[in-house]
Design a protein with these regions (language model features):
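Intrinsically disordered, low-complexity Ser/Thr/Pro/Gly-rich regulatory segments
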Residues: 1-70, 75-247
Length: 247
């Protein structure tokens, strides 16, 4: 019987191992500044798991006459022409974009507020319901409880929809109409403590969203079991709900 929990934890272990290997060459003074390394590490992991019909880049997204801020990771369809491409740097029309991710070395309340604000604005410019995530390799202790960060997330109201605060904390936006165990009474972000599984669940949710966007159907059962191996679902590991502000 496959051990899918161990497999998902191995994704976290692999990302942490590569991060630490690079960190051996870069002292603490420069580690926080040099975000590009972390983007490359995560981009490489995504390419290993995403279907060949999509690509991963970095750059900007254009919708009508509006331009996003620079986005760390853009997942886009290969069957759309790009406006510009040079190696991994792209300028993409919004219609081609399936997901965007902001990558952070370590989430603190202040860093999280700014990241959520920027990702929300980029999501509004793109103007479509896509995977919009924030991925942090490390997290300050329970920074998701900070009132200012929670307020920024509540105001995003689902535009930012997946967040990973280190290897153990995963946040996902849920609408009340979605059937699940122990739901909040209004649209909200659920905060889950899932040891060594947050990285894997973040990537799994991205893959699932892209599969649905491309094929209009849910994941096959075998993939669903592999991507979400927590027995009894992750709802048993929910720590909190953050209710959203009505848009």
């Amino acid at each position: 019987m496959p051990d899918y929990t161990a497999y998902q934890k191995s994704i976290s272990n692999e990302l942490i191992s590569i991060k630490d290997r690079v960190r051996n060459f870069i002292d603490d003074r420069h580690w926080g500044e040099d975000g590009r390394y972390k983007e490359i590490i995560l981009s490489h992991a995504l390419r290993q798991h995403l279907p060949e019909s999509v690509s991963v880049g970095t750059g900007f997204v254009v919708n009508n006459n509006s331009l996003t801020k620079q986005i760390d990771i853009i997942v886009y369809r290969n069957d759309f022409p790009l406006m510009f491409k040079q190696d991994d740097f792209i300028i993409a029309p919004s219609e081609s974009v399936l997901g965007i991710i902001e990558v952070k070395s370590k989430i603190t309340a202040q860093v999280g507020e700014k990241a959520i604000r920027n990702a929300t604005e980029n999501g509004r410019i793109i103007g479509r319901n896509i995977f919009n995530g924030i991925f942090a390799f490390e997290s300050q202790n329970e920074c998701f409880n900070n009132p200012c960060l929670r307020n920024e997330l509540a105001n995003s109201a689902g535009i930012v929809n997946h967040l990973c605060f280190g290897a153990d904390i995963f946040l996902k936006y849920w609408e009340t109409s979605y059937p699940r165990i122990n739901p909040c009474t209004q649209d909200s972000y659920a905060v889950y403590q899932i040891e060594k599984l947050a990285f894997g669940y973040f990537i799994s949710n991205l893959i699932e969203d892209i599969h649905i966007a491309l094929h209009g159907q849910q994941l096959p059962n075998a993939l669903n079991r592999m991507f979400y191996p927590i027995e009894g679902t992750k709802e048993a590991h929910k720590k909190a709900d953050i209710a959203v502000v009505e848009r």
